[in-house]
């Protein structure tokens, strides 16, 4: 990788918790993104929002079963991807 080149990671995450990406889950998602330096964009159906924006995430209206496309750009892109995958896999800490 060149000195000024930034890593980009793309992934798809399926919302598996019963309440979907509601306010508390969106806050946890945004908080997770804020722990890192990378830029995160989340998209659904052509709508793209910043991963650290609770209001933006809410506009995606992601119900259970929705697949979100995530684009992560930055030196710690892999770490962000792991953290977000873990968060979603853990039902946003809500136990389903």
Stretches with model-predicted labels:
Residues 1-8, 96:
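SAM-dependent methyltransferases
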Residues 6-12, 67-69:
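Intrinsic-disorder/low-complexity, polar/charged segments enriched in Ser/Thr/Lys/Arg/Asp/Glu/Gln
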Residues 10-12, 59, 86:
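Acidic/proline-rich low-complexity IDRs
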Residues 14-63, 72:
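Compact, glycine-rich, soluble single-domain proteins
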Residues 63-96:
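C-terminal structural segments of small proteins and small subunits
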